[in-house]
Amino acid sequence: MIADDEGFLYPQIDSARCVNCGLCARACPSLNRSEPRKPLAVYAAKANDTELRLASSSGGIFSLLARQILAKGGTVFGAAFDKRDWSIEHIEVVNEEGLSELRGSKYLQSRTAGIYRKVSATLQSGLPVLFTGTPCQIAALRAYLNLQPSISTSNLYLVDVVCHGAPSPMVWQKYLDWQCEAASAQGRGSAPAEGRNIRRISFRRKNCGWKRFSLSLRFADDKEYLCQFPDDPFMRAFLKELCNRPSCHDCQCRELRSGSDLTIADFWGIEKFHPEVDDDRGTSLVLVNTDKGKSLWNHVVSGLDVMPATFDEAVAGNPALVRSPHPHRNRELFLKKCSAKRFDFLVVKMLRPCFVSCARTFVGQVLRRMGRRK
């Protein structure tokens, strides 16, 4: 895998060794689009264990699913921080202690080098496997295993998340450099060239509740950077489509095309549809997509507070289920300038409304006021 100028990883074919078998094209989810699906059932759910829920991004569903697999001697695969540089990689976990590494949202493209081979080897041993990831990672694993028909997937459980998109790893590293430079200037950390004194990162601290979550960086001196998601420059760049992977703007795996057994996400909008469930500590959206997913779900439901919901409610709060966002008009310019400019200033500049947008807003406000006066 080779990073391009925007920092995204892509496979590179060694033409000297290629035998033109076509396996790479057959395994690529972007080149092999499946048919859209509708879930068998939709639920709003939250773990009865309040501490577990507060430690999770939303309702704690992943941990209960993972515990079920571990209880059978199985293996759980998911995304974790590589604390050498705070990038993201997929790892395998075989005990309860390791689950904390996988718990919590990570808004980055994770490295999966060699992980599909490990999944294949675990399945060959006959042990159950829970693999969690983005829809495209689920689709890629399915395609990889389909090329090995001798391997049974009866013990494989696939869980994807509703994915907004994958930001550039390069942008994330530039953001961390900016954070460490700011900490160093305040005399409470080292500059990036001296190594990052970061001890912990959480994309989803619930210090102000689930709906107003914060991005948190804990430094070696125990000082914490804490910023609510609408105000943090990295989260703004991510959510405003300044730095996401090009394929995310035309994702081939939306509409449940990944082939996952279960899909989990935050149940955004729960306060509108089922206010009696919402306590602002986190409620998960769960889509049961297959009979295998239903079987796994039935084994964990006793530890949950569950309410039936509809697919329309799910889409209303998570439009990324069915459609891809458009890239920001300044996306390419932002990625070109990311290395040379101060990160927070550049994000503000790139997201500044253009003249046409400001003019449209002004005219709209005038027309609305005129309408009220008539």
Question: Model-predicted segments: where are they?
Answer:
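Iron-sulfur cluster-binding cysteine motifs and their immediate structural context
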Residues: 1-13, 22-39, 261-262
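Cysteine-centered iron-sulfur cluster-binding motifs in ferredoxin-type domains/subunits
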Residues: 12-31, 60, 136, 245-251
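Entry/capping segment at the start of metal-dependent catalytic domains
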Residues: 23, 27-62
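Gly/Ser/Thr-rich loops at beta-strand to alpha-helix junctions
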Residues: 57-61, 83-84, 131-141, 165-167
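Long, compositionally biased charged/polar accessory segments in the mid-to-C-terminal portions
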Residues: 72-75, 180, 196-374
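Glycine-rich phosphate-binding "P-loop"
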Residues: 89-114
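A short alpha->loop->secondary-structure connector
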Residues: 98, 146-161
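Short, conserved secondary-structure transition motifs
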Residues: 162-174, 205-209
